Amino acid sequence: MVCYQDDTISYTQLFRFSDAERYQEIKEDLSNLLNLGLQIASITCDGHKATLKAIKKIMPGITIQRCLVHIQRMCLLWLTANPTYDAGKELRMLVLMIHRIETHNDKQYWIHQLNDWENKHKDFLKEKSYKAETGRYWYKHKLIRRSFFTIKRALPNMFCYLTDSNIPKTTNGIESYFGHLKNHLDLHRGLTKNNRINFIKWYIYFRNKSRL
């Protein structure tokens, strides 16, 4: 399910049953939100390619805030709890600092540290392994590279919340909402697919009603 929620009052403006975040569907949903007359100041999302592409197509001037928890969680997963290399250990420390950035000075210091890390380990990031039998090359430290470049690509949209305190820096609100919904569904595991869908619709209706 894809859900569009007002973070201020936890009101679900629109939802769609889908098995994935799909560009055409999200593009249509965003157009429908605008057609409803909603004034959208910013969007906080997990950074899925289809979602970002749809936002830039339908709302090219909108402020996009990347969910910091999502970035941090994925990078920590790739770097592991005990990285083998110093580059991984140092990058992991920087990743752990992300959620502590509360001022523009914090941001500038952190970015400076990240740039220093890149300059220090740029040759390490380029190291490749080679298989003579196939002539195939691949990056030797792909998970460290993935972590770093995930951050680097997200960087322009990571700290919008520092300029506007009304912008949520995470999607924790909607994640909590989904968690609560899942707990209710778990109590009714015997429901058919159709009845589960109807249950979700009524759940959203009554939750929205309580927010008005």
List the model feature ranges, each with a label:
Residues 10-14, 26-29, 38-42, 66-70, ...:
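Glycine-rich loops and low-complexity Gly/Arg-rich segments
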Residues 33-36, 82, 94, 194:
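Low-complexity, intrinsically disordered/propeptide-like segments
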Residues 23, 68-78, 82, 109, ...:
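Short alpha-helical interface patches
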Residues 42-52, 89-212:
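Acidic/histidine-rich catalytic cores and adjacent linkers
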Residues 42-49, 54-96:
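Conserved beta-strand -> loop -> alpha-helix junction used to position metal-binding or nucleic-acid-contacting
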Residues 1-44, 49, 53-61, 154, ...:
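RNase H-like nuclease fold core
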Residues 21, 85, 188-190:
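A short hydrophobic/aromatic micro-motif that marks alpha-helical segments and, especially, helix-coil
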